[in-house]
């Protein structure tokens, strides 16, 4: 890991040397009182010490955890009502070095390793705050620019994105094209040296707050297949004809801004093209495994959070003259949950290590995303059940975790598509 990342973490820890808040403060956004604090992230569900992280990662984790405790959790309820987080928290995240961690320093990023990035994914999940779209911005959008952008594009956008002053989004999904990227209808046509962009996108995370959107568009309808006629464009907020529609009111992830985007004869200069013309589908296929690994990591970390919340609850809740935790059926359910979570954590950690060394393939990433997101929904269901009626109350974190989980098997490619990709690799002759 880069020395810059470690030094920044040490500075933040020194500056924030105040005592750790009492247990209830960790979940103060929920309204529930006297809830035990989630244990150290290294020992969630008693799996023992995870061996993929170094002492530097542990130091960094402490600073990330403090950030979410102090800058995110206290404001999350307010953000849920607004349907968006504040721009201020983006800039604070930038100052703390939480954005663009895995982007090389030469490109304006932090220069940390993938596991440092994973620390931020985990800690956000452990905070039970899904509002800030930091991971999409840093680990889905920024890699496209860093990997396929020109020197000018990198220098213009990456430093501002790392600072949290330019919020990024990526616009793939359309009203009639979700997991089927080859069904995209948004198009860009040449006009001299410029491009004219028309179409619409939907369900775009960070869409409302975005300053920069990577737009997937058809540039060659005569290509031998739709995959050979797609390009990526950098569209900046304020461009004439670029219209942000309404913020969408979702079932879960209520603090995360999600929007419709419309493009009506948006004139784009030649340098708005990201990468090569008609290579967009190839770029998407190269980057989607990381997106799916991200979803898997968020999913298993959410499972760990929900398990700890539930274990703490049943150890305190009394029924039939004893704590619920001492009822055999509850113990068996906890045993099942813990086993499933620990086994899945081992697989996701293995995928993280593979991806750190550039060896994670599409099939493995798809398996991780499919399995972990399905488990997340299963764990959410069982944990709400173990909370009884209180689990249905919004003031309890488990209720929010339940509705936030539902989208995980849908975005990033539905789990039905994940099975197709896994099966394709299994039966392939190569």
From Swiss-Prot:
Active site: 291
Record bears the keyword Oxidoreductase: yes
Cofactor dependency: FAD
Residues that hold FAD according to the record: 170-179, 203-205, 317, 328, 385-389, 414-416
Post-translational modification comment from the UniProt entry: Acetylation at Lys-318 and Lys-322 in proximity of the cofactor-binding sites strongly reduces catalytic activity. These sites are deacetylated by SIRT3.
Single GO biological process annotation from the record: carnitine metabolic process, CoA-linked
One Pfam family linked to the record: Acyl-CoA_dh_1
A GO molecular function held by the record: flavin adenine dinucleotide binding
List of residues that carry Phosphoserine: 54-55, 191, 362
Subunit structure: Homotetramer.
Name the UniProt record assigns to this protein: Long-chain specific acyl-CoA dehydrogenase, mitochondrial
Gene: Acadl
């Amino acid at each position: 890991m880069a020395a810059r990342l470690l030094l920044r973490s040490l500075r933040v820890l020194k500056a924030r040397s105040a005592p750790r808040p009492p247990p209830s403060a960790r979940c103060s956004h929920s309204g529930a009182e006297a809830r035990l604090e989630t244990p150290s992230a290294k020992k969630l569900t008693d799996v023992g010490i995870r061996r993929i992280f170094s002492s530097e990662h542990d130091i960094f984790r402490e600073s990330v955890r403090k950030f979410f405790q102090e800058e995110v959790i206290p404001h999350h309820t307010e953000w849920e009502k607004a349907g968006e987080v504040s721009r201020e928290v983006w800039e604070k995240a930038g100052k703390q070095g939480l954005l663009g961690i895995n982007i090389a320093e030469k490109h304006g990023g932090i220069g940390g390793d993938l596991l440092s990035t994973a620390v931020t994914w985990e800690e956000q999940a452990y905070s039970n705050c899904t509002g800030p779209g930091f991971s999409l911005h840093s680990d889905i959008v920024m890699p496209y620019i860093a990997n396929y952008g020109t020197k000018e594009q990198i220098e213009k956008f990456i430093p501002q994105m790392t600072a949290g002053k330019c919020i990024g989004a990526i616009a793939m999904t359309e009203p009639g094209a979700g997991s089927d990227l080859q069904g995209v209808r948004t198009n860009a046509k040449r006009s001299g040296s410029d491009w004219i962009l028309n179409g619409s996108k939907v369900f775009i995370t960070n869409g409302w707050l975005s300053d920069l959107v990577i737009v997937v568009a058809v540039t060659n309808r005569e290509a031998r297949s739709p995959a050979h006629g797609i390009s990526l464009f950098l569209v900046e907020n304020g461009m004439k004809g670029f219209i942000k529609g309404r913020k969408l009111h979702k079932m879960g992830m209520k603090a995360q801004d999600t929007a419709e985007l419309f493009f009506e004869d948006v004139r784009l200069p030649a340098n708005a093209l990201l990468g090569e013309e008609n290579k967009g589908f190839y770029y998407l296929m190269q980057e989607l495994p990381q997106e799916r690994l991200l979803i898997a990591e968020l999913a298993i970390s959410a499972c760990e959070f929900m398990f700890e919340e539930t274990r703490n609850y049943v150890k305190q809740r009394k029924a039939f003259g004893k704590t619920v935790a001492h009822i055999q059926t509850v113990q068996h359910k906890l045993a099942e949950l813990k086993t499933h979570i620990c086994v899945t954590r081992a697989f996701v950690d293995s995928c993280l290590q593979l991806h750190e060394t550039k060896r994670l393939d599409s099939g493995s990433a798809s398996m991780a995303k499919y399995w972990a997101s399905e488990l997340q929904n299963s764990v959410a269901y069982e944990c709400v059940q173990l909370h009884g009626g209180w689990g249905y109350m919004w003031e309890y974190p488990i209720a929010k975790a339940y509705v936030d989980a539902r989208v995980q098997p849908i975005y990033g490619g539905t789990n039905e598509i994940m099975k197709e990709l896994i099966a394709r690799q299994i039966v392939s002759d190569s």
